[in-house]
Curated annotation (Swiss-Prot):
The keyword Nucleus applies. PANTHER family: MULTIFUNCTIONAL METHYLTRANSFERASE SUBUNIT TRM112-LIKE PROTEIN, UPF0315 PROTEIN-RELATED. Keywords: Cytoplasm, Nucleus. This is Multifunctional methyltransferase subunit TRM112. Belongs to the TRM112 family. GO terms for molecular function: protein heterodimerization activity; tRNA methyltransferase activator activity. It comes from Saccharomyces cerevisiae (strain ATCC 204508 / S288c) (Baker's yeast).
Amino acid sequence: MKFLTTNFLKCSVKACDTSNDNFPLQYDGSKCQLVQDESIEFNPEFLLNIVDRVDWPAVLTVAAELGNNALPPTKPSFPSSIQELTDDDMAILNDLHTLLLQTSIAEGEMKCRNCGHIYYIKNGIPNLLLPPHLV
């Protein structure tokens, strides 16, 4: 499961719908196996579009839980066109590419901060199915 995916998953227990603690899910870095896939091509245009859509505080929270405390506290801002990007902008985009797209969680657990339900990640696939008593 790509790191970027962590920014779009929330607890699906019905009782958690009204809670602000259902997103982001909590990741225990000691139980998560991270892998790097360097075969994914760097695409600055895609990253410019996706950075606007990510919830930056959630990115910071999950990254810290997985052991990365090097991210800036505020979301980086970029010019609207690729032609206006500076070398520093490209370096930041490259780092975001490595984190968001090349970093994946192969095995591990995600836990709801509200109800405590644990979702397992196996072979890079999160199991978001709920037992009948939680639906």
